[in-house]
A protein has these predicted regions:
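Mobile genetic element proteins and their domesticated derivatives, centered on retroelements
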Residues: 60, 74, 80, 99, ...
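Acidic/histidine-rich, metal-coordinating catalytic segments
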Residues: 106-121, 139
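Basic, flexible linker segments flanking DNA-binding modules
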Residues: 1-49
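Short loop/turn microsegments at loop-to-beta-strand junctions
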Residues: 70-71
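Two-metal-ion RNase H-like nuclease active-site motif
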Residues: 54-64
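A short acidic, amphipathic alpha-helical/loop segment
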Residues: 98, 123-125
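Active-site beta-loop-alpha junctions of metal-dependent nucleic acid enzymes
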Residues: 63-67, 84-106, 110
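Charged alpha-helix within mobile-element recombinases
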Residues: 107, 126-190
Length: 190
């Protein structure tokens, strides 16, 4: 650039002709899940928002350090019942299969997700569980506050710097964490 300001012409031979690179901001939408308007959180039934019916779940992932392992967290909105399962990665097919296994014995009316690409198979999950899927607005994780609160409680047991690349024998700890969270006294439950 100094050569250009001094009146020289050598900058024209450079690949970018001396221009600074700009970050592509239009590519951000490709990293989020596009959902239909009828699946927005704003159209979710009032009974879900008021927490009067059992069977409405919020689902999220907690990612281990260096992307090594993922913890699938499902929280029922009324009872605050928690279900946890360990996954090796957050590929959409594996996540969908895990949600189906995790909630197959539960009453499931609705599922609430964020807009991550790991939920691309939400239709498959909804069909298998006989539920309806709803999605938060982009970058609005507080719209599924029950599961976000639970993620914070889980981080008291599993630190952010901790990898989730566990052996099968270590799943005992996951069951222990789930039991502790489910038996935890809560003011909201009376």
């Amino acid at each position: 650039m100094r050569e250009r300001r001094a009146g020289g012409q050598w900058y024209r031979l450079l690949p970018m002709r001396g221009r600074k690179r700009r970050r592509d901001r239009t590519g951000k939408s490709r990293h989020r899940l596009k959902v239909a308007p009828e699946q927005e959180l704003a159209v979710r039934p009032a009974a879900v928002n008021e927490r009067t019916e059992f069977g409405h779940w919020e689902v999220d992932l907690v990612i281990g350090a260096r992307q090594e392992g993922v913890l699938l967290v499902a929280v029922e909105r009324v009872s605050r019942l928690v279900r946890l399962v360990f996954l090796r990665n957050k590929e959409a097919d594996g996540v969908a299969a895990a949600v189906e296994r995790l909630l197959s014995g539960e009453v499931v009316q609705t599922l609430t997700y964020d807009r991550g690409l790991e939920w691309m198979r939400h239709e498959r999950i909804a069909k298998a569980l006989g539920a309806v899927s709803y999605f938060c607005l982009p970058y609005h994780p507080w719209e599924k506050g029950a599961v976000e609160q639970m993620n914070g409680l889980i981080r008291r047991y599993l630190l952010k710097a901790e990898s989730f690349a566990w052996e099968e024998a270590d799943h005992y700890w996951l069951e222990l964490i789930e039991a502790n969270l489910n038996t935890r006294p809560r003011r909201v439950l009376g």
